[in-house]
Amino acid sequence: MDFSLNDDHLALREAVQRFCDGEYPAEHRGNAETPEQAQGRWAGMAGLGLLGLPFPADAGGSEQGPVEVMLVAQELGRALGGGAFVASTVMAGQLLMRLGSPAQQQRWLPGLASGERQASVALYEDGARYDWQRVQLQARATSQGHVLNGRKTGVLQGDSAGLLLVVARTSGAGDERHGLTVFAVDASAPGVQVRGFDTLDGRRAAHVTLTDVAVASDCVLGTPGEAADAVEAALDAAIAALCAEAVGVVDALMVHTAEHLRTRKQFGAPLAKFQVMQHRMADMAIALEQLKSMACAAAMAVDAGEPAQRRRLVSAAKVLVSQLGRQLGLSAIQMHGAMGMTDECRVSHFAKRLIVIGQLFGDASWHLKRV
């Protein structure tokens, strides 16, 4: 595989770096966002064209691929920013592009690209762990469409999403792939209850309960009962973007840790002079290169056209991110000492984000079964 970047890639990365440096100053990274800050940053990302990056041009996008998404995710990871980029632009956007009719894409994608609205995929359910195929939420057909009843858990940025792409079962039972259908549901529709909560890293997710929610027939994405392949592809695209984000987080983690070791003194000498610390930093640098390679491989596999290869590479990358991310985060905290556990120390926020990324969409043990 050729992992080299062309001039357009470098220009994109530089533009996102400038945006992050302005919107996420280093001394404030990891701090909780106010609603005004979140709205302003989201509008700024829309202004740069990041929110419609993979969308068709006639829907307000720039028709870029997963490598460009990877570069953006890496820079957002360095800044501990991005908000709903993975949930809305990557995962929900992929579902709309793969399943939506031209009319449906024109209906929803321009709003996502402009930042006027966010979307999120309501996928997982209670007791299913990471098995996204175990869907019990029922969609009952009516003369005007469908009626949805059930509950979804851990919907990323679910309490800020105006559009929910709900994976429901129209036929079959248990964990059958056949019978899954995606519905576009307005989050403010009657019968939709969204209960938001903070995640470990200070971001947001939500539990969504749907009680007799009426969905019109023009809000069904794709052929009823045949959505499984598209859902899996969108999920893999989101996982690849998360792996890229983890690369950025680890890169920033290394920079902050190295600076601490250079400036902090013990026994009259900087910590960087101690061999054990040098070995730890060398291990971290090696791990970062591993993560970069696997994140690139996962991104390039997203549009490779071979689902089996995509699944293997994306899951292999997620295994490495889940294992090394937590390990590197805790190692950086240890190199900072007790202060590394505090909210005032930026390293603690990088570590928490890596732990969350390691759990999202499947942990190491789950993806090892999939490789």
Language-model-derived ranges and their functions:
Residues 1-83, 99-104, 111, 115-116, ...:
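Alpha-helical interface subdomain recognition
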Residues 63-72, 131-135, 185, 214-215, ...:
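Structural signature of FAD isoalloxazine-binding scaffolds in flavoprotein oxidoreductases
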Residues 115-126:
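A short, Trp-centered hydrophobic/proline-enriched beta-strand micro-motif
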Residues 120, 136-138, 163-167, 171, ...:
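Conserved hydrophobic/aromatic beta-strand scaffold that supports enzyme active sites
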Residues 131-149:
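Cytochrome P450 C-terminal beta-domain/meander region
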Residues 134-136, 154-155, 186-220:
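Flexible, small-/acidic-enriched active-site or ligand-binding loops
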